[in-house]
Every structure is written in C-alpha cells, then in structure tokens.
Regions:
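Non-catalytic, beta-strand-enriched accessory regions in extracellular/secretory proteins
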Residues: 43-70, 74-85, 93-94, 143
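C-terminal edge strands of extracellular/lumenal beta-sandwich accessory domains
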Residues: 27-37, 65, 86, 92-103, ...
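Alpha-helical transmembrane segments forming the membrane-embedded cores
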Residues: 209-357
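Alpha-helical transmembrane helix bundles of large polytopic membrane transport and channel proteins
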Residues: 96, 104-119
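N-terminal leader/pro-regions and domain N-caps
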Residues: 25-52
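Bacterial N-terminal signal peptides that target proteins for export
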Residues: 1-9
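N-terminal signal peptide c-region/cleavage motif recognized by signal peptidases
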Residues: 21-23
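Extended, solvent-exposed segments with strong compositional bias
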Residues: 113-149
Length: 361
C-alpha cells in the first residue's frame, strides 16, 4: 500500500510540474486548409491564442491566413520549417498584410492584397542551428519572429509563400536588414506558421495531441514505420513475454490482461519519446526543454510500470473494493493527460477498472 502511495505521489508531482510548464511553452498544432487567396484565406478565430498552423507549399504557391484584430492589439507571427527542408535550402517567405501598414521589402508580384492594404515582407536567413522542442519532441529551424501592435482595426492576413525572390525590408521596424537578394527555392517544402501569444488549450485540443504528434513527425519527413518502431518493439517484447508465460497467463482475468496491455502501451510511448528525443537532439543543439521531454518519459514509463505491477498482483487484489477501480481509473486519466498509450492505453486502463478482477471458472 505504501509503495502504491509513493508511485501516485510521484506521478502527481510530475503532473504539477508538467502543467505549470506546458502553458508557457506549448503551441496548439493545427493542420489543413487551402487559403489560395485573401478571399479564401484560412480564417483564424482568435489570433491571440498561440498555435502553429502546419502546411505544405509547391514552388510559386502562396498560402493566406486571415484574422480580425482591433487597433492596438498585438500581432505575433513566426515561421518554422523542418530541418531537412531547411538543409535543402527551402526558406519560404512570410508576409503580413493589413490596413495601415506601409509596404516594406520587395512585395512579390503574385501577392494578392485588398485595396488600401500594405504588406510587410519579413527578411531573414537560415539560422545556424535548429531549435529543440520538448513536448513533441521535435527539431526545426525558426526562421522569423514578428511582434507589432495593429495600426488599424480590421482583417489582417499572414501569407506564406514558396516564391523565387524575396527582398529585405526598409524602415525602423525591420527585423533584419539583409539587402535585396534573389534565391532559388526547392520545388516544395513544409512550413509552420506561428500565430498568437496566449498559450491556452481546450480539453479536446490537449487530449488529441498524440494524433498531432504523428502528423508533426510526418511533417518533419518521418515515415510511419519509423514513427511506430519503438512502440511496436515494446509491444512485441511484452507479447513475447506473455507467450513464454502462457501457462500462467491463460488463467488471468480479462481485467488483468487489459491492465498488462495498457502498461505495455504506456511503456511504448515512453520508448517513443526517448527515440524521438534522440532523433531531434541529433539535429539540434542542447536545450533546457530536454527536461520537459524527460518528464514525459518518466510519466509514461511510470504509468506503464504501475499498470503492469498492479496487474500482476494476486488475482484477489481489489476484488469487491474501490481500490482497483480507483488505481486503474487514475492511470487512465493520467495517460490521457500525459499523452501516454496513444488513446488505446488509457482505454484499456479504464477497461481494467471496470471488468471483473477475479477469473471465473
């Protein structure tokens, strides 16, 4: 009993640290949308909410995002690209379009603007080193950051383009003065548009992060086989152990089997975090956000060990009491909050809490 209290005290401490750090460092990932022109721009409801809008560009493409801002409100923009695309020379343009803005930089001929609008073309060069992000975990090049107050109330547009020319901007607010330049851009590449500054999540956005993680790894250029290799190997090792002990396992109740499988999925998530952390660190420099990844790893592994340990206890453990239901319900909730188990792990933990613990017959 004391050991179980220590386990859950440790997990509770991780939850506190995790949720104190998450709002300050994480962005809501968003995928999809067309936005081929200002008229069909991808509309953003709350431009102050911090999010990353992921997309892909072919050569010559421009993608438009529209949002409404009141005069004096902050407009915060940023642009990131995968490490592989950046190493190939893909550096898309980032342009802010709006009322009260003076044209700065060389505005592309293909850029569409409503009448009376101005455009700020952000100038930048590829950074020396990619950035490590601890929650996914991932690595990327951060190309540009832009933070101004809206000069007028109205609709503003952020345009990301894979165009063949980009020039520096003039004016006191220029981010970097690089001089007019012509550059060839690869045929296509991926990008992430950062918009907003308030780090908030809805419950749905938070719980659905595991699906977004897979999409982000794909955005980076990873294949599904590579993404799921750590999880598959962990499950394979666990199932092999079950097979070798099949004479014992055959007498397990459905609740115990569900608990063991939930534990394996939690452990597999921890192995995936380790795997992705090593991949990302091999591309980027060391960052303090590594400690966020360690929290994710320890949480997933801790949940996995706890689920398996509880499942292997004597079959009469928790029968007819609230203890078993409480423990596995807690594991299921923690799995959802820590993005452990790819949804299936928490589901199996809840199943273990509900199914009969004692094997019939």
């Amino acid at each position: 009993m004391r050991q179980g209290i220590l386990w859950f005290s440790g997990i509770f401490l991780l939850v506190v640290i995790y949720f104190l750090s998450a709002p300050a460092l994480a962005h809501v990932p968003v995928f999809g949308g067309e936005g081929k022109s200002p008229e069909t721009a991808i509309h953003i409801e709350d431009p102050s909410k911090s999010r990353v809008l992921y997309g892909e560009l072919d050569s010559g493409d421009l993608r438009y995002y529209g949002f409404n801002v009141e005069k004096g409100e902050r407009i915060v923009l940023g642009l990131i690209i995968p490490v592989e695309d950046g190493n190939k020379g893909f550096t898309p343009s980032l342009i802010l379009i709006g009322q009260g803005l003076a044209d700065e930089g060389k505005v592309p001929e293909k850029l569409e603007m409503p009448e009376g609008y101005g455009a700020k073309v952000l100038s930048y060069s590829l950074p020396e080193s990619p950035v490590y992000e601890g929650f996914t975990p991932s690595a990327f090049y951060s190309l540009a950051k832009f933070d101004i107050k809206a000069p007028e109330s109205g609709t503003y547009y952020a345009a990301v383009g894979a165009i063949q020319e980009a020039g520096s901007r003039k004016g006191e607010d220029a981010i970097q003065e690089k001089g007019l330049q012509e550059r060839e851009i690869p045929i296509e590449g991926n990008y992430g548009l950062i918009l907003g500054y308030k780090e908030t999540f809805t419950l749905k956005e938070w719980i659905s992060i595991p699906l977004s993680q897979i999409k982000i790894y794909r955005w980076e250029g990873q294949g599904l086989f590579l993404i799921f290799t750590p999880l598959v190997l962990t499950l394979a090792a666990g199932l092999l152990a079950i097979f070798l002990k099949r004479e014992t396992v055959v007498g397990f109740s459905p609740a115990r089997i569900s608990g063991i499988l939930a534990g394996l999925l939690f452990l597999g998530t921890g192995m995936s975090y380790i795997f992705q952390m090593l991949i990302s660190l091999s591309k980027s420099s060391f960052s303090s956000e590594v400690f966020i990844t360690f929290i994710m790893i320890f949480a997933s592994v801790g949940l996995g060990v706890a689920a398996i340990a509880l499942s292997l206890k004597d079959e009469s453990y928790g029968t007819g009491s609230a203890s078993k239901r409480l423990y596995f319900s807690g594991l299921g909730i923690a799995g959802l909050l820590f993005w452990a188990g790819w949804f299936i792990g928490p589901f199996l933990a809840f199943e273990a809490a509900l199914l009969p613990w004692k094997h019939k017959g």
